Amino acid sequence: MFENVIGDWPKHERFIITSCDDRYFNQYFPRFYKTFNEHWQLPIHVHVIDPKNESLKKLQYLKLSHTFCYTDSNILKWPYSFETYCQAQRFIVLGHHMLEGQSVIVADVDCYALRKPTKQQQDILESD
């Protein structure tokens, strides 16, 4: 499964990761990307499940890192839904690829940043 993840893992010490299928990428990721870039100013990594060619082209123009994969039908034979599979991907990919010393914020793709992090949040972001 993990050998089929295409793309480069980010080398940043701190970044935000999210994952989604192609539908959620087009529906929610533009707002996610815009607001987190504007308010949090941390690198963003997105993992896209079953992306269409149009989505892959969009990714090339954005200032971020990305990986993607295509669903192996054998995985969906487990007693899990496709939605569960999609929801778990960011944690699975992160657990498999995270480098020593990386500090990663895991976020839902349908969330967005309303404002800059508070001082307390910023201190947490900068601590290690």
Predicted regions and their residues:
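Short secondary-structure transition/capping segments
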Residues: 57-58, 79-81, 117-120
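GT-A fold catalytic core of metal-dependent nucleotide-sugar glycosyltransferases
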Residues: 86-128
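A short, glycine-/small-residue-rich helix N-cap motif at loop->alpha-helix starts
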Residues: 25, 78-89
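N-terminal anchoring/stem segment of glycosyltransferases
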Residues: 1-78, 99-100
